[in-house]
């Protein structure tokens, strides 16, 4: 503790002192609440809602609302909030992190701010670390909320959309971070707004906040799917375009860096693939593959734009001539080049949507958290989430004795000493909880105890219900429990009869974790609510932490002392050396998380733009103005690309290319000629093209009707946006992986990622406009309402290695080609003897 803290108290001390008058006010309202009948107490909720609707703030209502909740808890649950718990509740309401020691009743504390914030009617989310705790807390605390006239719901794996929607529409919703995050992503993939399940993210309390916002922050949530692209279609499209003839079947626009089918080429495609209208929106996928195959074969040049290296396609940087490691062409072009060059076409599971917890939780209007251990990570909470940490005083003084670490030369010596200590302690009847850093080490220690005939239970974080049951008995006389550090977290260990007389629960740590916070959590399992207890860590110089980060000075001391295998040293210098090693690791991990957030923030801004655009489409906003703006942008950009800053000698050729390019997208063939337009200015040409396009679009709308046209616009925009966004996610991922491999002289990799990622995003937005306009002008207008379809089906939702497979198989839109059917490439051979040969 620094001199300032000694004189003025710590930050937490000062904050608690500032909050104390509010606690006094809540206390003073107690007698008044006790006089109310059950019905009168419940009516208070409706009174608060009415006052809130009339403009009174939640802060103003806090003392009275907390007093109501406290009295209801006493009646329904038989538990009255202590003053310290009221302090914790106020801190949580203020959108901060409350550090409360194990056994101080965090679950009960949360009821106070949850009740108060539920009055706003915008939904309160309570996040727990597993489904078991979410269900337990909902059923347990739900009694209190329902008594007060509020509804509760729980989100667990396996619910239907309707069940999820009902749970989210409740005043208070419990669930895990994974479930809430995945539902957010799925809501931004729906094709009808009625399919959404979540409401806007309002107020959230994260239990075990350090575990969720720090330990799990590095691994993103990913929803994956088979996508609509299969590698065989790239090969078939490649085979088809290789037979085409330049000028007759396709033309090359060098300025636009593109190749397009002529009318004859379109007819060839319709014949080869057995379709009536190549330009129909239902053939979007086929058009995409053929367009990219044309570009790969006739625009992209080997050893200029790319090289074939180790049977892979490597992009050549057009400015430096160097290979751009890790970078792939976007929009399926890379796969098209792979098909062209006969190397393996990379088949990847498509990322349909992804987000990190860091960015998901920062979307809440107000975020709060509670845990037994947060102070060591206070800097990270403040820098990344804007949350400060307030340490809440314990109801009773902590009586647990934390003994100095014992350091052994070898792991064998350490484990022998641990087994000996467990046996000696067991003779007294004192319960022992042994914390390990991995399942493997738990099982190793268990095998040593079995050899000695010592009865014990092993707990690994696999079965949450069973976990809670075993942990709840870990404090009974004579019980020995071995657990990985995180196992059973969230369940209190209550001491059995006669345990205090033998010294309370003894904690043995088998090695120091790389984070001091995890060590503190293990210690905190003992000494709850002022109980007696003991804790000690056993360490060897062969432990991972000591081996990788331990100081050479400590190793030298041990060597100088000439310790035997079973001998240990115990000193303040040793403990300080270990803490310094932990601080090194913590600092390193924080830097990694901050760097990843720097990358993800780029993607996050792009995600917000796309999701907002999708939402506007779904909400039924009039899209007519947006479509007209897209038409203007596509024409204006095309005119600028072809006719801006060119030599007079090239003007007529470029004008001809421009007309062909826009005829392919929206203008009627033969409507404009070079002869007619060559004397016009660029502005006049642009105006004529726009007027013509608008007239055609107006005629199309008059034919089909405005309502039908708006739905066609919705269907096509959703389909194009989703297709392009999924490809863009992949492209950004490849960019992130490759950017670290490239040498940027005096350039920050994150800055480079921001710049390139921004350029890629702008390109994607431009491609969305071009494709949307193309499909709208070529769509085959029918009397029946167009059907919205998902671009890709979800096949899995994963956070790190935790994959939740969805049983439904992805539905592919394209008709399946039988092995004995004619090959759709148009060769006249059977599929199995042609393009089907290489398809696995």
Curated annotation (Swiss-Prot):
Residues 787-821 are annotated as: Disordered. It comes from the Bacteria. Its cofactor is Zn(2+). Residues 802-819 have a biased composition (Basic and acidic residues). GO terms for cellular component: cell envelope Sec protein transport complex; cytosol; plasma membrane. It is a peripheral membrane protein. Keywords: ATP-binding, Cell membrane, Cytoplasm, Membrane, Metal-binding, Nucleotide-binding, Protein transport, Translocase, Translocation, Transport, Zinc. Zn(2+) binds at residues 823, 825, 834-835. It is found in: Cell membrane; Cytoplasm. ATP binds at residues 85, 103-107, 492. Pfam families: P-loop_SecA, SEC-C, SecA_DEAD, SecA_PP_bind, SecA_SW. Belongs to the SecA family. PANTHER family: CHLOROPLAST PROTEIN-TRANSPORTING ATPASE, SECA INNER MEMBRANE COMPONENT OF SEC PROTEIN SECRETION SYSTEM. HAMAP family: SecA. This is Protein translocase subunit SecA. It comes from Clostridium perfringens (strain SM101 / Type A).
């Amino acid at each position: 503790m620094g001199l300032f803290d000694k004189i003025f108290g710590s930050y937490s001390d000062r904050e608690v002192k500032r909050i104390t008058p509010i606690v006094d006010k809540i206390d003073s309202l107690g007698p008044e609440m006790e006089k109310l009948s059950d019905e009168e107490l419940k009516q208070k909720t409706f009174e608060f809602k009415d006052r809130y609707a009339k403009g009174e703030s939640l802060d103003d209502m806090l003392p009275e609302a907390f007093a109501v909740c406290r009295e209801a808890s006493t009646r329904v649950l038989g538990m009255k909030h202590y003053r310290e718990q009221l302090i914790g509740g106020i801190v949580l309401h203020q959108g901060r992190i409350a550090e409360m020691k194990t056994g101080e009743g965090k679950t009960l504390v949360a009821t106070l701010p949850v009740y108060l914030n539920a009055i706003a009617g915008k939904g309160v989310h309570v996040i727990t670390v597993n489904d078991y705790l979410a269900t337990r807390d909902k059923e347990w605390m739900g009694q209190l909320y329902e008594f007060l006239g509020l509804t509760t719901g729980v989100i667990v794996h396996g619910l239907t959309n309707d069940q999820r929607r009902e749970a989210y529409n409740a005043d208070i919703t419990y669930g895990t971070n994974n479930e809430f995050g995945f539902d957010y992503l799925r809501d931004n993939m729906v094709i009808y707004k009625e399919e959404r399940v979540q409401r806007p993210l309002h107020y959230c309390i994260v239990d075990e906040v350090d575990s969720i916002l720090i330990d799990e922050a590095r691994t993103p949530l990913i929803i994956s799917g088979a996508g609509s692209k299969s590698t065989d279609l790239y090969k078939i499209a490649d085979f088809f375009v290789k037979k085409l003839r330049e000028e007759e079947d396709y033309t090359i626009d060098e300025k636009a860096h593109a190749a397009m089918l002529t009318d004859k080429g379109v007819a060839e495609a319709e014949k080869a693939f057995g379709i009536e209208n190549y330009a129909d929106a239902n053939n979007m996928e086929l058009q995409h593959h053929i367009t990219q195959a044309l570009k790969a074969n006739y625009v992209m040049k080997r050893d200029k734009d790319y090289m074939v290296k180790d049977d892979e396609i490597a992009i050549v940087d057009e400015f430096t001539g160097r290979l751009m490691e890790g970078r792939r062409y976007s929009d399926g072009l890379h796969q098209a080049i792979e098909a062209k060059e006969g190397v393996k076409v990379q088949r990847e599971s498509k990322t349909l949507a992804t987000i990190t917890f860091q960015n998901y939780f920062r979307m809440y209007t107000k975020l709060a958290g509670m845990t037994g251990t947060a102070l060591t990570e206070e800097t990270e909470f403040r820098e990344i989430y804007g949350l400060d940490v307030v340490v809440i005083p314990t109801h009773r003084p902590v009586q647990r004795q934390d003994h100095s670490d014992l350091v052994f030369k070898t792991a064998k010596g350490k484990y022998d000493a641990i087994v000996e200590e467990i046996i000696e302690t067991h003779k007294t009847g004192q319960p022992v909880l042994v914390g390990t850093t991995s399942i493997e080490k738990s099982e190793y220690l268990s095998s040593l105890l079995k050899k000695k005939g010592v009865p014990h239970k092993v707990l690994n974080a696999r079965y949450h219900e069973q976990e809670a049951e075993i942990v709840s008995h870990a404090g009974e006389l004579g019980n020995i429990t071995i657990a990985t550090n995180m196992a059973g977290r969230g369940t209190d260990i209550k001491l059995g009869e006669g345990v205090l007389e033998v010294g309370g629960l003894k904690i043995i740590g088998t090695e120091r974790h790389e984070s001091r916070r995890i060590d503190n959590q293990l210690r905190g399992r003992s000494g709850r609510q002022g109980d007696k207890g003991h804790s000690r860590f056993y360490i060897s110089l062969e432990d991972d932490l000591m081996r990788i980060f331990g100081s050479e000075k400590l190793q030298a001391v041990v060597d100088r002392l000439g310790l035997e295998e079973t001998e240990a040293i115990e000193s303040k210098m040793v403990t300080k050396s270990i803490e310094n090693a932990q601080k090194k690791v913590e600092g390193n991990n924080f830097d990694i998380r901050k760097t990843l957030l720097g990358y993800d923030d780029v993607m996050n801004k792009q995600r917000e733009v796309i999701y907002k655009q999708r939402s506007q489409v779904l909400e039924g906003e009039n899209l007519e103005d947006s479509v007209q703006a897209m038409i203007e942008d596509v024409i204006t950009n095309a005119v600028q690309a072809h006719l801006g800053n060119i030599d007079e000698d090239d003007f007529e050729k470029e004008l001809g290319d421009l007309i062909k390019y826009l005829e392919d997208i929206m203008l009627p063939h033969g409507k404009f000629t070079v002869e007619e337009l060559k004397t016009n200015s660029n502005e006049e040409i642009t105006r004529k093209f726009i007027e013509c396009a608008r007239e055609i679009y107006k005629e199309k709308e008059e034919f089909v009707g405005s309502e039908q046209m708006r739905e066609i616009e919705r269907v096509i925009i959703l389909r194009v946006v989703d297709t392009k966004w999924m490809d863009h996610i992949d492209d950004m991922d490849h960019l992130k992986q490759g950017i670290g491999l490239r040498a940027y002289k005096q350039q920050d990799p994150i800055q480079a990622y921001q710049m390139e990622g921004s350029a890629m995003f702008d390109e994607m937005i431009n491609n969305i406009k071009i494709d949307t306009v193309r499909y709208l002008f070529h769509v085959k207008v029918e009397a029946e309402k167009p059907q919205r379809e998902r671009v890709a089906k979800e096949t899995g939702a994963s956070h790190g290695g935790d994959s939740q497979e969805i049983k439904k198989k992805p539905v592919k839109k394209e008709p399946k080609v039988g092995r004995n059917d004619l090959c759709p490439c148009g060769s006249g051979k059977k599929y199995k003897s042609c393009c089907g040969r290489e398809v696995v």
